[in-house]
Amino acid sequence: VSELVNDVIFKIDKNQIKLVAMDPANVAMVNFTLLSSAFTEYKVDKPVSVAINLDAFKTILRRAKPSDVLTIELDEEKHRLRVQLKSEATRTFNLALIDMEDKEHKVPELTFPVKVETLSYRIDEAIQDMDVVSESVAFVAMKNSLFVEAESNLNDARTELPADGET
């Protein structure tokens, strides 16, 4: 997500954390929803919008260890997002909220002729492979495979993700 947008507004309510954002060139849209059921504990007293810099947030989250318990709290008085990582030690980071105009982005109703389910690391690896050749990729779905392709003036690359137990 942070590859496309830097500053974002998360809309948080008792059921979910939602992000809808456009990249600066108005070419790509991010539509992300994280349901409350994904958390061990989730408490929201009232719906709130929180604007943050994703790169700064990501830098904090990268400090998390597998054994850490992550707690995120909004401090409205100090205008900060408190991020706590707790295991053997308790590490607390306070991320300043930013002021942003809350633009409503209409999510288009799209229908796709194909549905592919796979593990995210497989897509990540394929995209990283394509990055060697080009800054853009194409996804091509065939009957029993998903292809991730890239080409430049001189080079091209292709990764095939065949239909199996993981795709």
Predicted regions and their residues:
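DNA polymerase sliding clamps and clamp-related checkpoint/processivity subunits
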Residues: V1-S2, V8-V132, V140-T167
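Polyanion-binding surfaces on beta-sheet-dominated domains and ring/shell assemblies
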Residues: V137
